[in-house]
UniProtKB/Swiss-Prot annotation:
It is found in: Secreted. Expressed by the venom duct. Disulfide bonds join 2-8. Keywords: Amidation, D-amino acid, Disulfide bond, Hydroxylation, Ion channel impairing toxin, Neurotoxin, Secreted, Toxin. Exists in two forms, due to cis-trans isomerization at 2-Cys-hydroxyPro-3. The cis conformation is the major form. GO terms for molecular function: ion channel regulator activity; toxin activity. The cysteine framework is C-C. The modification Cysteine amide is found at residue 8. This is Contryphan-Fr2. Belongs to the O2 superfamily. Contryphan family. The modification D-tryptophan is found at residue 4. One of its GO terms (cellular component) is extracellular region. Its target is unknown, but this toxin may modulate voltage-activated calcium channels (Cav) or calcium-dependent potassium channels (KCa).
């Protein structure tokens, strides 16, 4: 779940 996470 970008932009909150890093696994975009």
């Amino acid at each position: 779940g970008c932009p909150w996470d890093s696994w975009c």
